[in-house]
Amino acid sequence: MEAAPSPGSGLCCKPGGRLDMSHGFVHHIRRNQLARDDYDKKVKQAAKEKARRRHTPAPTRPRKPDLQVYLPRHRDGSTHPSNPDCEESGESSSSGSSEPEPPGHQLFCLEYEADSGDITSVIVYQDDDPGRVSEEVSAHTPLEPLMREALKLRIQEEIAKRQSRH
């Protein structure tokens, strides 16, 4: 009546209470876990690379001009624009002509960008002459006569379009 099993009886436990690992089942689980971890690392790395590629700056291209914003009159009755980008032509004019501001309603701010990248800003009023405005722009940025005439026609169209709204 021996209570201790004999080594040849076919039990799965080794002496000392350890499991018999010779069948490879646990090794298969460990290999599977390692392979899964490696795959997860590769997927995360690929996602990071894709995110980096997506956030790189695109090649520079000309930006759309800002939308024209309605600026209400001040309570004191003055019509000074609060937009510093659109400066009045009388202040920045270097031609020496000190024409007073037309008393008409301000329609829009014309910004002409030359080929060199210089921007000329002129405020166009309701009573302005398109020829005078195109001359003022060409005083800051030399224009060919055909370009000056095309600018004059475009200013006429814009004034007519905005006057029909008012």
UniProtKB/Swiss-Prot annotation:
Question: Where are the residues of the annotated region Disordered?
Answer: 36-108
Q: Where are the transmembrane segments?
A: none
InterPro entries, alphabetically? UPF0561
Q: Locations of Basic and acidic residues compositional bias? A: 36-49
Q: Which family does the record assign?
A: Belongs to the UPF0561 family.
Name of the protein this chain belongs to: UPF0561 protein C2orf68 homolog
The protein's organism comes out as Bos taurus (Bovine)
